């Protein structure tokens, strides 16, 4: 793991949190390394942090800093070489009729209600299915960097809004897009999550930027292992972005 002093971020300080229960691997303790102060983390600085394995949650910029565990591996997709799988092509075809609208971060009651349905349907009992408006806002709608909120709706007559199906929060970096969080209608027959990643890959191509950062790949966690299905991909190992292992076999857990 790259030590903070090796980063070109001399104005920042880094501290390790106390241990807390891991959200992805049962029975394990996690720790994070947090970059501070947040008001100095502007767009350029944040791009450098993401390239070094950090992520953003609200105003907090962090990366895993766990004792004796390196299961969380930063993963990004080089969009120029991306080739969708057969199932990914099906997901794109199924949902390409959705209409996207890119907005500044803003609170919309309809978004919040969809967020609660998503948490209840996909992550019931995970602690976020009863988030208050304040918790939702702090988690997704507070940012000091170049962030956007993207709505995905069913088609509707001109002048009307179609049914909301998905909302995605993303950050625009110097070298690509960073997928912060996506929530959607918990329809077991839909593939909204897969479609969203494909949409971000296509947007990144249109912006003529090289990468989509998908956060942490965790091979042992079905919730996080799906990211390796977007190929080819690169992982940050010992401070260096490396191509995925050629002999890796990737399963296909349902990712919505």
From Swiss-Prot:
Alphabetical list of InterPro entries matching this protein: Acyl_CoA_acyltransferase, Asp_Glu_LeuTrfase, N-end_Aminoacyl_Trfase, N-end_Aminoacyl_Trfase_C, N-end_Aminoacyl_Trfase_N
GO terms, biological process: ubiquitin-dependent protein catabolic process via the N-end rule pathway
E.C. designation(s): 2.3.2.29
Class in the EC hierarchy, top level: transferase
Highest taxon in the source lineage: Bacteria
Localisation per UniProt entry: Cytoplasm
Catalysed reaction equations from the record: N-terminal L-glutamyl-[protein] + L-leucyl-tRNA(Leu) = N-terminal L-leucyl-L-glutamyl-[protein] + tRNA(Leu) + H(+); N-terminal L-aspartyl-[protein] + L-leucyl-tRNA(Leu) = N-terminal L-leucyl-L-aspartyl-[protein] + tRNA(Leu) + H(+)
Keywords: Acyltransferase, Cytoplasm, Transferase
Pfam families with a match to the protein in the record: ATE_C, ATE_N
A single cellular component GO annotation: cytoplasm
GO molecular function: arginyl-tRNA--protein transferase activity; leucyl-tRNA--protein transferase activity
Record has tRNA processing as a keyword: no
Family: Belongs to the R-transferase family. Bpt subfamily.
Function: Functions in the N-end rule pathway of protein degradation where it conjugates Leu from its aminoacyl-tRNA to the N-termini of proteins containing an N-terminal aspartate or glutamate.
Name this protein carries in UniProt: Aspartate/glutamate leucyltransferase
Organism annotation: Methylibium petroleiphilum (strain ATCC BAA-1232 / LMG 22953 / PM1)
Gene that specifies this protein: bpt
């Amino acid at each position: 793991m790259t030590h903070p002093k090796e980063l070109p971020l001399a104005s920042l300080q880094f501290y390790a949190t106390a241990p807390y229960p891991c959200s992805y691997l049962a029975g394990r303790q996690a720790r994070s390394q947090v970059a501070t102060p947040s008001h100095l983390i502007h767009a350029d600085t944040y791009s450098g942090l993401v390239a070094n394995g950090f992520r953003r949650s609200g105003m907090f910029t962090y990366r895993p800093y766990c004792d004796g565990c390196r299961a969380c591996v930063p993963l990004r997709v080089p969009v120029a070489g991306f080739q969708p799988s057969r199932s990914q092509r099906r997901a794109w075809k199924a949902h390409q009729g959705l209409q996207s609208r890119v907005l500044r971060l803003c609170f919309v009651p309809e978004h919040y209600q969809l967020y609660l349905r998503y948490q209840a349907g996909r992550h019931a009992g995970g602690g976020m299915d009863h988030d208050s408006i304040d918790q939702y806002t702090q988690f997704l709608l507070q940012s000091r960097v170049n962030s956007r909120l993207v709505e995905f709706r069913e088609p509707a007559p001109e002048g009307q809004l179609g049914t909301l199906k998905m909302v995605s929060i993303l950050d625009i970096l110097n070298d690509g897009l960073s997928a912060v969080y996506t929530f959607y209608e918990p329809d077991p027959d839909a593939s909204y999550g897969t479609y969203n990643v494909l949409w971000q890959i296509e947007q990144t191509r249109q912006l003529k930027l090289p990468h989509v950062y998908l956060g942490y790949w965790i091979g042992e966690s079905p919730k996080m292992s799906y990211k390796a299905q977007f190929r080819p991909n690169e992982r940050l190992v010992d401070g260096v972005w490396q191509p995925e292992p050629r002999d890796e076999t990737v399963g296909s857990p349902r990712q919505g």
